[in-house]
Design a protein with these regions (language model features):
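Cysteine-centered catalytic environments shared across enzyme families
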Residues: 1-247, 259, 263, 270
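Mid-to-C-terminal catalytic subdomains of enzymes
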Residues: 252, 270-274
Length: 274
């Protein structure tokens, strides 16, 4: 579409689409994008900074404004800490929502004055002022007359189409596989080069919380190599500080522990994984 409008691409990088898209559509660009993203474009002609975050908030985006009127932003809060103008103050108001919902539920983070750009929002920043708008929202008012079977078929088709779109890659692709329904379904649709699983041993030596056997069986059935590791309690306890460092804010979801080790395992073999 952009090429048809006369835009000439000089690279094969997908991010170049954002630059040409902004040239053509301005702040309407975010609503036209599909995928997971968080980006900023600085328009030197208008002195406007334009940014957006994907509709589900898959990609993080943090920002704050210093007393000097500077806008700091990044995909991690820790990337802002070294700036001399960053406000190093705890946001006590974030504690109650966190204890209630077990995650950082406010747009303002645990750092006073540092915010998350909400999912499905774009912003323009000029002359020290932030203007923000939502560009997408789900509509639950629509009632469907489809049968259960038709709904299931529609969902299956949508999932497979989405997985296929994400499957496009110039390098090997891996998949996290817990042995549960959702990861097994995605793995079967994706057919990655490798799968990755971690499990826990219980104090009595059992495998109550371990699904690596099911993950290995599915991988074998699909003809895919499965890399798996068993985690000890010592490994998990020793990693808590590092895990919290990477999370930036308090995180009560216990799945962040196996996910940390799962990412380490996968990174030794692939760079793109689901």
């Amino acid at each position: 579409e952009l090429q048809a409008k006369g835009h000439i691409f000089k690279t094969h990088c997908d991010t170049e689409v954002i630059l040409h898209g902004y040239e053509e559509y301005g702040n309407k660009l975010a609503a036209m994008l599909r995928g997971m993203f968080a980006f900023v474009v600085y328009d030197t002609k208008t002195n406007v900074m334009y940014g957006a975050r994907d509709i589900f908030g898959v990609k993080p985006f943090y920002y704050t404004q210093t007393d000097a009127g500077e806008l700091l932003f990044g995909s991690e809060i820790k990337s802002l800490l070294e700036h001399p103008g960053f406000r190093r103050e705890v946001n006590a108001e974030a504690l109650r929502p966190y204890l209630t919902f077990q995650y950082s539920a406010m747009n303002e983070t645990f750092f006073k004055g540092t915010y998350k750009l909400p999912p499905a929002h774009w912003f323009e920043y000029k002359d020290g002022k932030m203007h923000m708008e939502r560009y997408w929202d789900v509509d639950f008012r629509h009632k469907t007359g489809m049968s259960f079977e038709d709904c299931a078929a529609e969902i299956d088709a949508r999932v497979r189409e989405s997985v296929a779109a994400h499957r496009i890659s110039d390098v090997k692709v891996g998949s996290f596989l817990s042995g549960g329904v959702d990861s097994s379904y995605i793995t079967a649709c994706l057919m990655p080069d490798d799968t990755f699983s971690v499990g826990f041993e219980t104090p009595d030596g059992g495998h109550k919380f371990d699904e690596t056997t099911e993950a290995a069986e599915l991988s074998q059935k699909l003809g895919i190599h499965n890399y798996r590791e068993m985690l000890t309690k010592e490994q998990c306890l020793d990693a808590f500080a590092d895990i919290q460092y990477h999370m930036d804010e308090p995180q009560s979801n216990p799945s962040s522990v196996p996910l940390y080790f799962l990412c380490q395992l996968a990174r030794r073999h692939v760079t793109v994984f689901f």
